[in-house]
């Protein structure tokens, strides 16, 4: 793998960024908003860079950098990875800023739910022609209305909640301050219980629940990424999927070794060595390493990481290229290592050349190849 000095990260939530992330990792996370003329567009912030609310503009009035979900779904490389090669897509629904006057403004929860329902209907319509695995996609939101809205629609899509609840208004510092009481009152095991009760297939959460001072001060069982705290987490979740943001260079390997999924803001081809000193492997699910290959990579001198990664990328088969027995061996190994509770028959029903079980640990490109500004998740 040669160092690509001229590589420039594409703008977040663009088709270019999302296709790159889909091809070069195990999947992507993207953000959707609903325009005035009911188009789903790829956009994170509550305002455009010109200070306008996307929900108050038609598709023709939005800045040129804002692209549609329709355009993304026209990309053959994105669809191939998603439907044929086992890559995953996390879709985050963003609610309008209350001052936009959309979705009930500051107080009308019922209108906010209706807004969510319309977004679900629009997305469901777009995805109907696409033959995807049932374990390839999740739709989530910080807004709790995502769950009640999903239960009022006949859809096969899977839904979850982002926790803690981050408001759709204010800067990132303000949002974190307001979310602090929710964070302190809920340990990660408690959140897992709530997600299970709601029927969510996975839990998206902040790294704060697992690492740093914040992980030690919330009420309830404390869990973590090392030692006894990791043992406690593994036994408690029993394979329940946890998607963690941000998967920084000093925590990415810890997340993977814990059997969790990390959402990364760094998919640069030049990022070949993690802060932990390990050689980086960003397709642990869709190009999985055997224990022998992992050991070989770990023992590679740091100065040779780039060339060794390039060599293994050429040698190691992708998930869709494995035989049924090879895929089964991986699933059985992962089930044993991380104490997955679901029966092997159920896991194998989600296992094929184009799909993997929900429990599988991945690296996901946040907003494609990483966020482009200092805003929140």
Language-model-detected regions and their locations in the chain:
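Phosphate-group recognition and catalysis centered on beta-loop-alpha active-site segments
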Residues: 1-377
